[in-house]
C-alpha cells in the first residue's frame, strides 16, 4: 500500500474478531474506522491505516501508518475500503500525515 519508503508507523493491537487487510483505516482502539455523513461532508474516525494484514486470532500485533504516502488503488484492492474523493478528504482531515495518491506507475 505504500507509495514511498519514507513513512512513520506505530505499534498497536487489532481488536477486531476477524482478519483485517492492509490499507484499511483503523482507530487506536484497534477497530476498523467508520466513514459517516453526507456526500461532500463525510467524516471518518480513523487514527491511521493498517500497514500489513493482521489476523487477531493468530497475532493481534500490528503497525498503524500515521505518516506517509499511500497508493489508494493498492490500498483499496487490498482492504476493500472505498477510497473515493469523500473518504480521502475525510481521511486527510482525520490523519493529516497521510497523503493519498492514485497516479503512481512505479512505487519506491
Regions found by a protein language model. Give the residues of each.
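Surface-exposed, low-hydrophobicity beta-strand/loop segments enriched in small/polar/acidic residues
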Residues: 1-108
